[in-house]
Amino acid sequence: PTHMAGLQVFFQAFENQNTLVNVFGLARNEVYSLIEKYSVTHISATPTFYRLLLPFEKEYSSVQRITFGGEKSDRHLFDVIHDIFPLAKINNIYASTEAGSLFAAKGDCFQIPVSIRDKFMVVDDELLIHRSLLGRSESFSFDGDYYHSNDLIEWVDQQEGIFRFKSRKNELINVGGYKVNPGEVEVVINAIDGIRQSL
């Protein structure tokens, strides 16, 4: 694991003495072979990883729980993954490096729990997180008592605290758990022989 969420999954599995199956860098058919071989029951990954499992060809009934996290997902991907793993309970986790896991969702809509609803604000569609939910670090900069997450949301039901993530406020996007600057990617792509322009 190379990221905070990966470390959390690793240590949770380690403490529970669960078998870990390394599928990093493997082709789609190799991943499915290992799921069958080891009767994998839990998968925790980014939407990018789950998209690599497409297209749907077969059901895998050993999988009991699927967890999405690390980047924005969508309803279509949840539905397709449910077709592949029909017996799995599917959760979508919102976590930040600064605060850890904060919300879980069944689909692409998240709900702020009533018990901590007063620890969040939304300003100009950006989700702000209260300092009491964050670890202690000199690298955090606060606006009063709130940390700017740079995550933009849209309310589905503001009264009930239900929202959906729209995008990021800054240029950095999360791809497979890595922070990526699309502008830098564009420069590299444009340097390839035969590429005139990328958009």
Give names to the regions the model predicted:
Residues 1-52, 91:
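AMP-binding/adenylate-forming
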Residues 3, 74, 154:
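Nucleotide-sugar-dependent glycosyltransferase donor-binding/catalytic pocket residues
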Residues 20-22, 44, 65-68, 174:
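Short catalytic-loop micro-motif centered on adjacent basic/acidic residues
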Residues 42, 54-110, 119:
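Gly/Ser/Thr-rich phosphate-binding loop
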Residues 48, 71-72, 133:
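Alpha-helix/helix-capping structural signal
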Residues 119-148, 152-154:
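AMP-binding/adenylate-forming core of the ANL superfamily
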Residues 43, 144, 150-199:
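AMP-binding/adenylate-forming catalytic core of the ANL superfamily
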